[in-house]
């Protein structure tokens, strides 16, 4: 791999770095050389991760060599000193020194080189983001350096009993109990297996690697990862492992002389605040009391619960009685706090939290004893629940333990002064639950058998909120971290970020993007195709006209945008509201006919499945791409890669401001106003509020344009983006390409967007994926004529349908056109062809583009009278090659200038109804389907509704790929669901695989009776 000298350090980089990459690596090395902190912004697609890894690991290697050389020099000096001493002492007095020198010399090897060499801690928001980074490291010249990821028991545990439990907290406490009682064989094998070849040979191990290796050697991956920390050059972990004091302690993280890299650092402010905050409810305290009481009853009445090493208690009934007394007093104290319900609660200084707990005799002096008692009780509950079906699960105790660890994270007057400055205590009425059931925490700790106490009228919620992210960052600096580097594609503006973090920043960088104007099209879309203003403000988002216009805007963009389209909403409620409204009005179905729609789910498993299905649609050579509707700050907007055809455009439907009336938001704005001075450059509350929305937008935009050859469109569909403040808070590289016309109509935007993609497809390199999605075009076929004598008179329903077609820009493909001949080899997925080549894939030929009758233009066409076309075909239109500011191409031939429509008497086939044709009464056993497959498809296409025909094609394609006969039959029975279509159903035997023919015949006999 090529080597480059950057700031005196040799860096191996896979290719000649761009200037932005050189600048970035130079700043990283500058931070490490001078032991300073840095804030570095480089847009997504500029190779930020690769540059970060190569520069930091190169510096660590350089430092290792430097330390090793210094050690050898020192050993040489010591040997010379020893020889002098031996001569003075008669030759034998230095035996002890010789032994010491031998040890020093042995330590001068690879292991000795680690002495004094900083370790890198690479933190990001999620494990999936870290897995991508580790994969990138494996592809560099530094893949020989040791890297390991830290994960939770939920991800790493392979114990058959523990791993089946729901929730990380349950697994954690059950694991601790088994380890303590030495009943986990996987844990017992960690020490003996950590030097096994299977472990040593895996230099870089992510979650999947750890589980795979741990399963192979039958050693616990969770504890194995902790053993590998010492020898690792770089550690990977989520933010909370690093920022949360309790997590740092649990993972034995040593921060001193460590290089801390915080990637995706636009989240760091929020993570710092949240990791230092807590919330506890009266219900949680009541659960604690119930749990303690239940255990006391067990112990007091000597209930026959067998006790072994695993379930042995580390507390007495007197300990429980004392704890219960404290909890009862805490409950009484919280319940007695006066709260103004009309004002949404009361706010107190941060130190008020100590007053609350001190009234229950929980204070700095005895906190550690109480914390240990809580941990012992939680572990005990976990073990007896597993063994004896005990109904308590300790959810409230877990919440209390975590709350105390945050409240008493420090001690002394200085700590209390920081609490008073950075924290607020907010107390509000606890809402009455509408339904009876289980109290489930975010981590799933409280289980299904948990008994839930009723919420009292005077129940409260006590929130202990940190509003200064610098509080957490200073804890890292206070532990003597060598350097802290914050980096992301969306950090700007840097000044307010640096001010809030409250740590010294010596190195700053705002990199430009490496793409040019031909690769990005940025538009502010202030109104929809119906000229309705697009504004997702709180006061307008219930406006049916706005919701409808937004839907039609997305619908209009879909045919123009190739591949994947990402649509981001400000919140889940607004996404759900739009989805429901569009489904009711039919807009959702119209979008789906152009591109299938996927919606971001909240559950982890459903999310992974949805993403997989989305990528499959994008990769489908016969598909039209897909639409993914998601939420700003959601999973899709953070860290996922939608390069190339996976994301050719992103639509931002609004500004994702935090909820204005939320107590935490109100207090954050108030806090900033209180601490803001001219000297500290801290932003105002209103500026912070606006910046929160802008950063979420910038992050969502960053999902597209992921590398130097990528291209895409950014469509800001909210007229508030015209405001100067909102524009100025967009990433600088986006502002550079932003149009300045505030009153640009919808039509010209469509035209410019269409030309942008046509031009990009011509001049920019196309990815491998895009070849699978390129639209196949054939020679244009003549328009189907229809002669209408006199005026065309249509009834109200027909007029409404035509108006709907015109307004919503729907084109239905020519149902009468099938080209070429069919070969079974062509039915299989084949490499795609360029637009100029003859199509080779049978199904893609069925969707080839032809000239169209433009039903959006209600003028009429003049056509030859000799046509034998039996139907009025409404075709997919062919993309215009000229410059066009309209959605639809202009008439391409001179003969079409004078237009009229004439009607030929013809049997009408309803393209949209599933009702039976009255002309057909049932299954005709003598009726035969065409032998030729192409002719058969022609007949099918004209015999069933369009929606069923498209589903039919999808069924055949899937069957050819997965050979799932049951799914094939299910799809065919839906397509041919009437007796008069059974002859077509029987004809489908020619598409069935040989080993499925007998099953097909049996099914046909069952359905058709013959």
From Swiss-Prot:
SUPFAM superfamilies: P-loop containing nucleoside triphosphate hydrolases. GO terms for molecular function: 4 iron, 4 sulfur cluster binding; ATP binding; ATP hydrolysis activity; DNA binding; DNA helicase activity; DNA polymerase binding; metal ion binding. Its EC number is 5.6.2.-. It comes from Aedes aegypti. The keyword Cell division does not apply. One of its GO terms (biological process) is DNA replication. Pfam families: ARCH_RTEL1 (PF23109), DEAD_2 (PF06733), Helicase_C_2 (PF13307). Residues 912-931 are annotated as: Disordered. Residues 7-333 form the Helicase ATP-binding domain. Keywords: 4Fe-4S, ATP-binding, DNA damage, DNA repair, DNA-binding, Helicase, Hydrolase, Iron, Iron-sulfur, Isomerase, Metal-binding, Nucleotide-binding, Nucleus. [4Fe-4S] cluster binds at residues 157, 175, 184, 220. Belongs to the helicase family. RAD3/XPD subfamily. One of its GO terms (cellular component) is nucleus. ATP binds at residues 42-49. This is Regulator of telomere elongation helicase 1 homolog. The keyword DNA repair applies. Residues 918-931 have a biased composition (Basic and acidic residues). A probable ATP-dependent DNA helicase implicated in DNA repair and the maintenance of genomic stability. Acts as an anti-recombinase to counteract toxic recombination and limit crossover during meiosis. Regulates meiotic recombination and crossover homeostasis by physically dissociating strand invasion events and thereby promotes noncrossover repair by meiotic synthesis dependent strand annealing (SDSA) as well as disassembly of D loop recombination intermediates. It is found in: Nucleus. Disulfide bonds: none annotated.
């Amino acid at each position: 791999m090529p080597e480059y000298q950057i700031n005196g350090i040799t860096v191996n980089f896979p290719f000649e770095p761009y200037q932005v990459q050189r600048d970035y690596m130079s700043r990283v090395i500058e931070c490490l050389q001078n032991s300073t902190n840095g804030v570095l912004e480089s847009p997504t697609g500029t190779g930020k991760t690769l540059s970060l890894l190569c520069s930091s690991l190169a510096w660590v290697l350089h430092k290792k060599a430097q330390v090793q050389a210094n050690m050898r020099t020192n050993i040489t000096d010591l040997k010379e000193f020893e020889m002098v001493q031996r001569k003075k002492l008669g030759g034998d007095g230095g035996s002890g020194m010789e032994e010491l020198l031998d040890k020093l010399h042995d330590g001068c090897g690879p292991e000795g080189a680690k002495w004094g060499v900083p370790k890198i801690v690479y933190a990001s928001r999620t494990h999936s983001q870290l897995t991508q980074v580790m994969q990138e490291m494996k592809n560099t010249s530094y893949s020989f350096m040791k890297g390991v990821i830290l994960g939770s028991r939920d991800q790493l545990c392979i114990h058959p009993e523990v791993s089946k439990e729901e929730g990380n907290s349950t697994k954690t406490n059950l694991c601790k109990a088994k380890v303590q009682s030495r009943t986990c064989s996987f844990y017992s094998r960690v020490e003996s297996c950590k030097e096994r070849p299977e472990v040593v040979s895996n230099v870089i191990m992510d979650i999947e690697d750890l589980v795979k290796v741990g399963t192979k050697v039958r050693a616990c991956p969770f504890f194995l990862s902790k053993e590998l920390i010492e020898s690792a050059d770089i550690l990977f972990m989520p933010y909370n492992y690093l920022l949360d004091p309790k997590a740092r302690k649990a993972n034995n993280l040593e921060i001193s002389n460590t290089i801390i890299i915080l990637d995706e650092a636009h989240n760091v402010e929020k993570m710092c605040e949240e990791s230092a905050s807590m919330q506890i409810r009266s219900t949680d305290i009541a659960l604690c009391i119930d749990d303690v009481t239940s255990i006391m009853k067990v112990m007091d009445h000597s209930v026959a619960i067998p006790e072994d090493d695993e379930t042995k208690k580390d507390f007495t009934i007197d300990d429980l009685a004392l704890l219960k007394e404290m909890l009862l007093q805490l409950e009484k104290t919280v319940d007695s706090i006066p709260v103004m319900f009309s004002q949404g609660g009361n706010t107190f200084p941060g130190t008020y939290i100590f007053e609350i707990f001190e009234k229950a005799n929980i204070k700095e002096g005895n906190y550690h004893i109480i914390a240990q008692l809580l941990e012992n009780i939680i572990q005990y509950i976990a073990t007896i629940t597993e063994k004896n079906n005990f109904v308590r699960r300790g959810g409230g105790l877990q919440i209390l333990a975590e709350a105390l660890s945050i409240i008493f994270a420090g001690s002394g007057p200085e700590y209390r002064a920081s609490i008073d400055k950075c924290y607020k205590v907010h107390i509000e009425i606890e809402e009455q639950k509408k339904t009876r059931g289980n109290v489930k925490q975010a981590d799933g700790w409280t289980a299904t058998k948990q008994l839930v106490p009723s919420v009292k009228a005077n129940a409260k919620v006590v929130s202990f909120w940190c509003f200064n992210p610098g509080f957490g960052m200073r804890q890292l600096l206070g532990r003597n971290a060598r350097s802290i580097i914050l980096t992301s594609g969306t950090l700007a503006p840097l000044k307010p970020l640096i001010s809030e973090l409250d740590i010294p920043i010596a190195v700053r960088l705002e990199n430009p993007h490496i793409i040019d104007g031909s690769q990005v099209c940025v538009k502010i879309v202030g109104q929809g195709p119906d000229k309705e203003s697009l504004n997702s403000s709180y006061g307008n988002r219930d406006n049916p006209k706005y919701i409808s216009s937004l839907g039609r805007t997305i619908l209009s963009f879909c045919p123009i945008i190739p591949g994947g389209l990402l649509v981001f909403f400000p919140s889940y409620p607004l996404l759900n509201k739009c989805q429901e409204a569009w489904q009711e009005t039919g807009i959702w179905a119209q979008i789906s006919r152009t591109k299938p729609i996927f919606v971001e789910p909240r559950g982890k498993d459903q999310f992974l499945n949805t993403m997989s299905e989305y990528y499959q649609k994008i990769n489908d050579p016969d598909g039209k791409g897909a639409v993914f509707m998601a939420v700003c700050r959601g999973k899709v907007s953070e860290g996922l890669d939608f390069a190339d055809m996976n994301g050719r455009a992103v639509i931002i439907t609004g500004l994702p401001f935090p909820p204005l009336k939320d107590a935490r938001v109100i207090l954050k704005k108030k806090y900033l106003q209180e601490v803001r001075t001219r000297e500290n450059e801290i932003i105002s509350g209103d500026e912070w509020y606006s910046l929160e929305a802008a950063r979420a937008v910038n992050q969502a935009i960053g999902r597209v344009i992921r590398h130097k050859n990528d291209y895409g469109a950014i469509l800001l569909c909210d007229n508030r983006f015209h405001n100067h403040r909102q524009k100025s808070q967009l990433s600088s590289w986006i502002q550079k390409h932003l149009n300045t016309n505030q009153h640009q109509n919808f039509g010209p935007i469509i035209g410019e967007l269409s030309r942008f993609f046509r031009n990009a497809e011509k001049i920019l390199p196309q990815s491998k994926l895009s070849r699978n999605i390129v639209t196949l075009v054939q020679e244009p076929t003549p328009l189907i004529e229809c002669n209408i004598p006199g005026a065309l008179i249509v009834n109200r329903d027909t007029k409404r349908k035509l108006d709907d077609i015109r307004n919503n820009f729907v084109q239905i493909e020519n149902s009468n056109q099938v080209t070429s001949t069919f070969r079974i080899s062509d039915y299989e997925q084949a490499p795609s062809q360029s637009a100029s080549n003859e199509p080779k894939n049978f199904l893609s030929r069925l969707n080839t583009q032809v000239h169209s009758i433009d039903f959006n233009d209600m003028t009429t066409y003049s056509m030859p009278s000799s046509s034998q076309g039996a139907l009025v075909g409404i075709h997919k239109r062919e993309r215009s090659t000229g410059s066009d500011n309209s959605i639809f191409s202009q008439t391409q031939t001179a003969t079409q200038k004078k237009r009229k429509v004439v009607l030929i008497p013809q049997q009408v086939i309803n393209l949209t109804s599933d009702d039976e044709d009255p002309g057909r009464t049932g299954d005709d056993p003598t009726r035969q389907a065409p032998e030729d497959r192409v002719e058969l498809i022609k007949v099918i296409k004209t015999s069933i509704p369009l929606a069923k025909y498209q589903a039919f094609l999808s069924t055949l394609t899937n069957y050819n790929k997965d050979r799932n006969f049951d799914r094939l039959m299910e799809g065919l029975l839906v397509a041919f669901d009437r007796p008069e279509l059974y002859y077509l159903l029987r004809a489908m035997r020619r598409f069935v695989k040989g080993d499925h023919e007998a099953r097909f015949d049996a099914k046909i006999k069952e359905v058709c009776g013959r």
